[in-house]
UniProtKB/Swiss-Prot annotation:
The keyword Thylakoid applies. GO terms for cellular component: plasma membrane-derived thylakoid membrane. The gene is psbN. It comes from Synechococcus sp. (strain CC9605). The keyword DNA damage does not apply. Its main location: membrane. This is Protein PsbN. May play a role in photosystem I and II biogenesis.
Length: 46
């Protein structure tokens, strides 16, 4: 069986990290932790 190139392994690793960070960001923005976020526009009165 052929061995995969190191570049393919690095690319898959980088993609996995990017997808993980994207998923974590979406979870923070829209999941249960989002209840603790403040809206600075609502806090500021003109």
């Amino acid at each position: 069986m052929e061995t995969s190139s190191p570049a393919l392994s690095v690319a898959i690793g980088v993609l996995a990290v990017l997808f993980g960070l994207t998923g974590f960001g979406v979870y923070q923005a829209f999941g249960p932790p989002s209840k603790a976020l403040d809206d600075p526009f609502d806090d500021h009165e003109d």
